[in-house]
From Swiss-Prot:
<keyword id="KW-0472">Membrane</keyword>
<dbReference type="InterPro" id="IPR036259">
    <property type="entry name" value="MFS_trans_sf"/>
</dbReference>
<dbReference type="GO" id="GO:0005794">
    <property type="term" value="C:Golgi apparatus"/>
</dbReference>
<feature type="transmembrane region" description="Helical; Name=1">
    <location>
        <begin position="46"/>
        <end position="66"/>
    </location>
</feature>
<feature type="topological domain" description="Cytoplasmic">
    <location>
        <begin position="1"/>
        <end position="45"/>
    </location>
</feature>
<feature type="topological domain" description="Cytoplasmic">
    <location>
        <begin position="519"/>
        <end position="559"/>
    </location>
</feature>
<feature type="modified residue" description="Phosphoserine">
    <location>
        <position position="297"/>
    </location>
</feature>
<keyword id="KW-0812">Transmembrane</keyword>
<feature type="transmembrane region" description="Helical; Name=11">
    <location>
        <begin position="475"/>
        <end position="495"/>
    </location>
</feature>
<keyword id="KW-1133">Transmembrane helix</keyword>
<feature type="topological domain" description="Cytoplasmic">
    <location>
        <begin position="460"/>
        <end position="474"/>
    </location>
</feature>
<dbReference type="GO" id="GO:0005886">
    <property type="term" value="C:plasma membrane"/>
</dbReference>
<feature type="topological domain" description="Cytoplasmic">
    <location>
        <begin position="403"/>
        <end position="409"/>
    </location>
</feature>
<feature type="topological domain" description="Cytoplasmic">
    <location>
        <begin position="116"/>
        <end position="118"/>
    </location>
</feature>
<keyword id="KW-0813">Transport</keyword>
<dbReference type="GO" id="GO:0005315">
    <property type="term" value="F:phosphate transmembrane transporter activity"/>
</dbReference>
<feature type="topological domain" description="Extracellular">
    <location>
        <begin position="140"/>
        <end position="144"/>
    </location>
</feature>
């Protein structure tokens, strides 16, 4: 059973066992399901991959709760005075981690395809740990507020670099270690840890403020906020250290091993073996050694006998960028990359525009006002907690339980439409709707963002692309998404001061509804094996298996 453990270092002596688990092993593992129907193997995978997303979310969104403290401490916002925190600097600090994300997602995604999942996984966590220590080590000797913000910006950029690496690597590793019928559920569980990270940020802030209540609220010693924000950010080191060693010692993905050991093809598609086997043309390879990695039911998962020793029916290796360029030079592949990237970009403009500025928005709608700075901070943290409990976390778990029933495409489409509708309601009635009404709209928008595109934009690149380009394609999609987050971070405070909150909500609405068109380009990936489709294209030509019938436009994607 060690072969079922993704973290085991044991190696089978049997050549077949080196390729894949047997039918008996899979059947045995699937009968021992525990919490949420997970096997022990899946539970470990969810823990180590999910803990990374818990940390990612905590680190990305804690700045939303720390920013008001920066206003009070460094920008003259104490004693009821209006802070002089420039909107450009404010936006830059908020965007720092997302800017780093872009570079991290592309860099680690490419390295994951080029060097292997094992070589890369865990290195991103080392970057996160180093960056977190440097952020909270902000020297008090830096004399100016601008200098302090530049220190924080620099190291939160590095933090974002590490966090960005976690997106493509965790998605790819989870996708490649999952049965087809469980893949969407497992990917959704991993991504749902983002909700717990956001929830934890609000809870930690409330606890820390309560611990500092006497000096802050009763004695007005607001210099103690230095300790509060450093603890808020520094506590992220706990999950980072817990998952570091398991990630560094994780075995290589079987799918990646197969893709690297695959046959190479010449320009005329002649088969070239990795050993001394004679060359054969594609048709002979298909006839003699055709394999099938997926079936229509769970009772027939991949077995060792499907592979054989020659590995003849697998896709070509991708040891350089030529394979990536060749794959996406075809429109029916490129449109999927275009759709995953642009829909993620449009989503993140609205999603991060709200989440990175949630405390500011709560203050604008009148929820987080208080009689002094302490009460304002506490009310802001409580508002974030309510939104996380009522909308953020439940949305993720609706996706977990329904993704294999409704499919990815339906969840993404309905989430985009309803979230856009909430922004339209806010935009059209911003000056007339009550505080409670605004708050309810934001809660509903958060729910359908997460029972919708925020989860599925993460799932799609992990499922729609084959293993040989999966890491890079996921990294590029996520990176363009983070460009949307950066845009929102940099422009939100400026735009709200120029055109008002209502018009900004119209922009968010347009982004959500605009993403609907790009979603229609995508196929439904439920029970879809991208590697099998890729093999059929390489060995036989054509577009691989597609859905036929009146709903083909939906299941295959338009154009």
């Amino acid at each position: 059973m060690n072969r079922l453990n993704p973290f085991s270092k044991s190696h089978s002596k049997n050549s077949n066992e080196n390729n894949e688990v047997s039918l008996a092993d899979v059947a045995e593992s699937d009968t021992r399901r525990h919490w949420l129907g997970l096997t022990k193997r899946e539970f470990k995978l969810m823990g180590f991959a999910g803990a990374g997303f818990f940390l990612d979310s905590y680190d990305l969104f804690i700045i939303n709760l720390v920013s008001p403290i920066y206003e009070y401490l460094y920008w003259g916002g104490l004693e009821g005075k209006k802070p002089h925190y420039p909107s450009g600097i404010h936006g830059l600090v908020n965007a720092a981690a997302n800017i780093g994300n872009v570079f991290g997602q592309i860099l680690f995604g490419f390295m994951g395809d080029f060097f292997g999942r094992k070589f890369v996984y865990g290195k991103e966590m080392i970057v996160v740990i180093i960056a977190t220590v440097l952020v909270i080590a902000l020297p008090k000797s830096i004399p100016t507020p601008l200098g302090k913000m530049m220190w924080i910006f620099a190291w939160r950029w590095l933090l974002g670099l590490g966090i960005g690496g976690d997106y493509p690597m965790s998605a790819t590793i989870t996708s490649e270690r999952s049965l087809l019928s469980r893949r969407g559920t497992l990917l959704s569980i991993v991504f749902s840890f983002q909700g717990f990270g956001t929830l934890a940020g609000a809870i930690v802030t409330i606890i820390l403020l309560a611990c500092f209540e006497k000096p802050l609220n009763q004695r007005g010693e607001y210099t103690k906020l230095e300790g509060v924000w450093r603890l808020q950010m520094g506590l992220a080191l706990v999950p980072a250290l817990l998952v570091l060693i398991p990630r560094l010692t994780m075995k290589e993905s079987k799918s990646y091993e197969q893709s690297k050991a695959l046959n190479k093809y010449t320009d005329n598609d002649t088969y070239i073996a990795d050993d001394d086997e004679p060359k054969k043309d594609n048709q002979n390879v298909v006839e003699e050694k055709q394999i099938n990695l997926t079936t229509s039911s769970d009772s027939h998962p991949t077995s060792t006998e499907d592979f054989g020793d020659k590995r003849a029916s697998t896709v070509p290796t991708s040891e350089n960028t030529s394979g990536f360029i060749e794959y996406f030079s075809q429109w029916h592949h490129f449109k999927h990359l275009l759709a995953t990237a642009v829909s993620w970009f449009l989503l993140d403009i609205a999603f991060y525009g709200v989440n990175l500025n949630q405390s500011v928005i709560l203050k604008a709608i009148g929820f987080s006002s208080g009689k002094n700075e302490y009460h304002t901070l506490m009310r802001g943290a409580i508002g974030n907690l309510i939104i996380a409990i009522a909308g953020y976390v439940p949305g993720y778990w609706f996706t977990v339980f329904l993704v294999e029933k409704l499919g990815r495409k339906w969840i993404q489409l309905q989430g985009l439409f309803i979230t856009g509708l909430m922004f339209a309601i806010l935009a059209g009635s911003w000056d007339t709707i009550s505080t409670g009404g605004r708050f309810a709209c934001f809660v509903i928008a958060q729910f359908f963002s997460n029972f919708g595109p925020n989860a599925t934009t993460f799932l799609y690149p992990a499922e729609v692309f084959p293993a040989r380009v999966r890491g890079t394609a996921h990294g590029l999609s996520a990176a363009l998404g983070k460009c949307g987050a950066i845009l929102a971070s940099l422009l939100f405070n400026f735009l709200t001061s120029v055109i008002g909150y209502g018009n900004v909500m119209w922009i968010f609405c347009g982004c959500m509804w605009g993403a609907i068109f790009f979603t229609l380009l995508l196929p439904e990936t439920k029970m879809r094996d991208a590697d099998e489709i890729d093999r059929e294209e390489v060995l036989r030509g054509g577009n691989g298996k597609t859905h036929q019938g009146r709903w083909s436009w939906y299941f295959n994607g338009i154009f």
